[in-house]
Amino acid sequence: MIYRYIFWDNDGVLVDTERYYLQASREALARVNIELSNEQFAEISLAAGRSIFDIAVASGIPEQSIAELKEWRYRRYAELLEQEEIALDGAADVLKKLHGRLGMAVVTSSQKHHFEIIHRRTGFLDYFDFCLTREDYTRSKPSAEPYLLALKQCGCAAENVLVIEDSPRGLKAAKAAGLACWVIPGHHTSAQDFAEADRVLCGIREVMQLIL
């Protein structure tokens, strides 16, 4: 198959941010005496694509309190993202070498504010034709909507587009949109089921080796 376009997931594929999202989520729930385990985070957020605040709902936390917790996490996550360089090893090299050889875009569930903080220092945005963040669509992954919107925007046929993901919900979204998907499992997703993936890779550099 000849791929003319790559849709990159962001968190866990290009940048090491999921640990900060977990930390912010864990700290938020701790404010109402709820513990969040790594396993719960992986299953609820990365596999099912649901809100970790479903745990708070099930625990009987009032709706207004949950809204305040979400806002608190939003601010805390932004603070954590400012702390250090978060580009994953090999990402810059791969993007630089693929740039100009085929089209590339980012399709992420990150909110625009956080996405901009993340890439303030990476320099990655120059490599992409466009980036879709959470505000650009109604239904997030595992819905096909984000990738269908990206497909419409890039102008390529579905068979010429490749998605790079790291989570079950991202894989489901890509497949629901009729797209090929290679998965690079991360620390929080290595134990998940990726049987539907067209390839499961060990790292981002394999993308370049297989494409070029």
Task: Give residue spans per PLM region.
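Acidic/proline-rich low-complexity IDRs
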Residues: 35, 68, 97, 178, ...
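Residues at secondary-structure transition points
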Residues: 16, 43, 47, 64, ...
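Asp-based, Mg2+/Mn2+-dependent phosphohydrolase catalytic module
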Residues: 1-4, 102, 111-212
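Generic structural signal for conserved hydrophobic packing positions in ordered secondary structure
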Residues: 25, 53-56, 73, 108, ...
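Short amphipathic alpha-helical segments and helix-helix/interface helices
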Residues: 92-95, 171
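N-terminal helical cap/lid subdomain that shapes the substrate entry/recognition surface
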Residues: 2-93, 100
